């Protein structure tokens, strides 16, 4: 056992998982949690890993990427997955939990580990030494200022304004065309042209679609200069035409004419399998959101891998500042974990905490931090958040679209999912067996 102590700031899902992974490797942990001394607007208890929104950890089967990441975490002795499996409630094919039992299980497991010291106080200065920052979307203002000092002022954000991300394979390429505005540079956008009738129908559907109600602590986000597409639609017929749906300079090469309106799709990942819908940040509920997007020519059969969202968040521009080990590039003793890194979702947050914890422990023990294979769900998340387009970086759930491509061949969607899952689980087993993790 080393005498070095690793600091973990925040006892949410990511921080609790990181602390557990560090301690089980024989390294002392100093775990800071400001609740109940100082509460956040979203939490209601002083327990670790409190689930503040849904009690579902989403799909449990291996036909879904989130099911795969959960299985990988079980293989790596995740305390979050232990708690979830122990405290599960009936939910069909999903893994849902009794949130009070779940938080209680995690709290007791982490607190009772002999190498974990829990300190209930607000952290306003980043401690010396090896530190994992896992303070979540509601990071306190004082600490956020210190994080800005570490990452640079331009690389810390305070809200999500994410447009939907879709699978390229679900786009009808016969209805779209590749072109950049005024043909500047290489043709970098897929363009979905609309007639006036199509635009009017689309705009009306946007106005009538059901939105997610804002929480009290989220109501300031529109003043940051980023407006939801449905708000633009409601402000008048021309608002979107002078904004994200502006057709100027985007003549359709098939007709030589300018469409009435254009929806632009921009490549989102290095592999070119995912595209985001430019300027379409939205507060629409997911069901209505898909129905509205299917009115866009070329997207009638769209597969959405991340729905558009707008909510209060605190996250860093990971492609600019983070390594795939979850270390800060410029200060290798600092790790980030959880939603702060740009992973989205309970399970993904815990998964990032698992990797950050393993690597913080390795650093404390004088070992090299490790990068998880990209064929795994854990590795693909780490790769996505560090290789995504930094200019438009927004948080992302795990999905098969961010995994490395499969060998060539025509396959159904279930067949592709099965191949991704089989490869991921085989890879994580081989990785664990070949490393001292």
Swiss-Prot record:
Compartments where located: Cytoplasm
Record's GO cellular component terms: cytosol
Swiss-Prot/TrEMBL catalytic activity: uridine(54) in tRNA + (6R)-5,10-methylene-5,6,7,8-tetrahydrofolate + NADH + H(+) = 5-methyluridine(54) in tRNA + (6S)-5,6,7,8-tetrahydrofolate + NAD(+); uridine(54) in tRNA + (6R)-5,10-methylene-5,6,7,8-tetrahydrofolate + NADPH + H(+) = 5-methyluridine(54) in tRNA + (6S)-5,6,7,8-tetrahydrofolate + NADP(+)
Cofactor(s) listed: FAD
Keywords for the protein's UniProt record, in alphabetical order: Cytoplasm, FAD, Flavoprotein, Methyltransferase, NAD, NADP, Transferase, tRNA processing
UniProt-listed GO biological process terms: tRNA methylation; tRNA wobble uridine modification
GO MF annotation terms: flavin adenine dinucleotide binding; tRNA (uracil(54)-C5)-methyltransferase activity, 5,10-methylenetetrahydrofolate-dependent
EC number: 2.1.1.74
Function of the molecule: Catalyzes the folate-dependent formation of 5-methyl-uridine at position 54 (M-5-U54) in all tRNAs.
UniProt-recorded name of the protein: Methylenetetrahydrofolate--tRNA-(uracil-5-)-methyltransferase TrmFO
Underlying gene: trmFO
